[in-house]
Amino acid sequence: QTLRALFQYKPQNIDELMINAGDLIYVNPAQQSDASEGWVIGTSHRTKSEKEPNVKLNGEAHNLSMSRSATNALSLQNAALRRAVLVMRHGERVDQVFGRSWLQQCLTADGKYYRADLNFPSSLPRQKDGMKQFECDPPLSCCGIFQSRLIGEALLDQEVTVSYVYSSPALRCVQTAQHVLQGLKLNPKVRIRVEPGLFEWTKWEASRAIPNFMTTAELLEASYNIDTSYRAHFPLSSLVPTESYEDYVSRSSAVIKQITSACPSKAPLPPFFAFPGVPGVILIVAHSSSLASLTRPLAGLPSRDSRDFAQMVRKIPSLGMCFCEEQKEENKWQMVNPPVKTLTHGANTAFDWRNTILGD
């Protein structure tokens, strides 16, 4: 097994090796699990041989023994190389801030879009059916775009390797995925797979109809990094309005199973990754309901009661995350802490200087 050192380690004893950040170390996984007091035997990549049991140190052959701190650093990298799923809610929507009538606030008399507040996006992508479709498929606010990019930058800081990205067809989810990838500096290297099966529980759609989502062609025209070769597991036509809770749970369980099956543990990753052929994180950008409906079946947990589910979903903020790691030895997935911290901020209400300062 190949591990990468996250930190430098200077030898304290003659049988220890100088390790620099980024060095590759070859270790036997069985020896890792049997390590005593944090010590593990491995082979430095400088030997140019994965099978050589000893390493050259100051002209002499020695077994490589690392202190607990160095071992912990390598074990962190080892954990990062496990196949994992990061389920994320989209960023802040414009209608969350400005209400359902947000579009009426920023359309001129002749139907042209203008930015009525700095938290409105500077422009809207073009749709063949016109602006009206955005009422049922709202975009991110400018703060939502910032939130998404900030999360991507945080994932980059933690050296999280994202190898696949899936998104609900909702525009806010596609936009979130796009800006997370920009923060990760993976755009356009990793493309977004739009999966209609990831859409939220359709019972919650106020219009009592499935929104007319932007087509792949429209998303590409708007410069979204879409994987055109991807074939969805659930076509848009399979989404029905006012589906039952049981049907939604069944759909979510099926789609997460299909996604993880389509992303093998030894994926042929592009050459820009530090470890070609090793597993990475499957990023899924969807809705607040997705955090439970996707991760619970993956972790082998039963679905929640529909009333408890509805109450729980209301507590999930923009960019809320759940993280599952595959435990190969036990052939199961386990929910663990996400690789980055939560994003918390306060409200910033509209300000009218005339009414506030002059009292008019």
Predicted regions and their residues:
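Eukaryote-biased feature marking scaffold/signaling PDZ-domain proteins and nuclear chromatin regulators
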Residues: Q1-R4, Q12-D23, D34-E37, A80-R82, ...
